[in-house]
């Protein structure tokens, strides 16, 4: 009976994995599009990042409403609404090729609503389908692996469409990437519409039991919420500030490293996150989230300490992952290498923190997922 039940979960799990990949594909678009809007609209460095920030600021507005939607209408309907919103958001970005920069930012903001809602769905659903504990963590790590693969594809795809001539970088040339995103949304909607997925939130709601508390009444959830807020800052901050430090001229206190080398080092950080998630997925069924998180955090702290104490004048030959999907070697300060290695540690932290934070929350899991998304911004 148990094996039959598990088999029935194969398609829902596969669907959640697909949604996980969709999230990073759309979330990853603003980064390569930043260079495009700079060229086409004459945007400043700050304005070029507005698409990226608009995407994540949307999480602050949509996180709690998304959690409420989960409780009220369930996982499937919430995901379907999110897919429609995402389709519209990317569609608005398509129009920006004719309607200007503000339209592009608006499209990124609307897409952010969709990404927030999908994140609110996939994380608790995978954890629930795995029964929480080790299996729940393992499924989230596997979904995270696909998330990393998709995130790797986006800049490569957009870079291929753009070519090497800077003056030819326009949204019109990048439209195929946006059309692919819209097609993915359309296919995902049709597949999810005809698929049956478990609805734990609706089953709990049918009990007509009044929610006497909120997720914030649970100490371990509050600690998890704080941890996820700090984690997101670390995960994004390490490659961002390392890249900035490498490319800043020496007069400005930086290392004045060539942008191509700096980009390869940052790309290696994200590639190591993919490797770490694949390893985490394979080990998730054998080790507890607490054990994995403890080891990853400890090693990460060690790498950061080494990055601080090692002199930046000490150079090493570091294997790097290049934007053309090849490997090479770059001469970088040893402190930068230790920062890049942190990607192995940050890789499994999201799944581990979420798994531990929602453990035992029961009917409060959906609301907890929404609160988590607010803290992502």
Predicted regions and their residues:
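Central cavity-lining transmembrane alpha-helices of secondary-active solute carriers
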Residues: 50-68, 267-279
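Extracytoplasmic gate region of multi-pass secondary transporters
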Residues: 30-31, 217-267
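Helix-loop-helix hairpin linking two adjacent transmembrane segments in secondary transporters
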Residues: 99, 136-196
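Hydrophobic core of transmembrane alpha-helices in multi-pass small-molecule transporters
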Residues: 101-118, 319-349
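Extracytoplasmic
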Residues: 11-43, 122-123, 238-246
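Conserved MFS/SLC helix-loop-helix module at the cytosolic interface between two early adjacent transmembrane helices
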Residues: 61-102
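C-terminal ends and interior cores of transmembrane alpha-helices
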Residues: 84-98, 299-328
